[in-house]
Amino acid sequence: MAKFIHSMIRVGDLEKSMGFYQQAFGLIESHRLDFDDFSLVYLRDVESGAEIELTWNKGQTEYTHGTGYGHTAFVVDDLDQQFNRLTGLKLSPAPIKEFKRDGALLARFFFIQDPDGYKIEVLQRGGHYQ
């Protein structure tokens, strides 16, 4: 059976991106590989063990996301507290929304963007979103 271990995104400012993911979501640096032309930094979520691989191609500062990329997602125990914390850090989360079907609440969430404009969904833990 396969195990999901990481997803990779390209970043324009490695230190800024690392700071964002560490500050916003508590990810920790688990591994780093530095080469002449690029660096790879793996940031781990200690709860799940999954990682985001930040790829910094030295000299490249901007990327396009194309039409295929949607978002990554994190769950939190207290969505309102996380929203207020990120707002206090001046990270500009979008307003909290509710997703319902036939009047039943399926999810509470908000979106935030990292320094390179990648969208991140933050969901209240519950139901399908564990």
Kindly label every feature range from the protein language model.
Residues 31, 74, 83-130:
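Vicinal oxygen chelate
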Residues 2, 8-51:
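Core segments of cupin and vicinal oxygen chelate
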Residues 46-50, 59, 79-81:
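Short, charged/polar surface micro-motifs in flexible loops or helix N-caps
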Residues 20, 79-85:
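Short amphipathic alpha-helices within nucleic acid-binding modules
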Residues 1-18, 69-74, 123-130:
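N-terminal beta-strand motif that seeds the catalytic metal site of vicinal oxygen chelate
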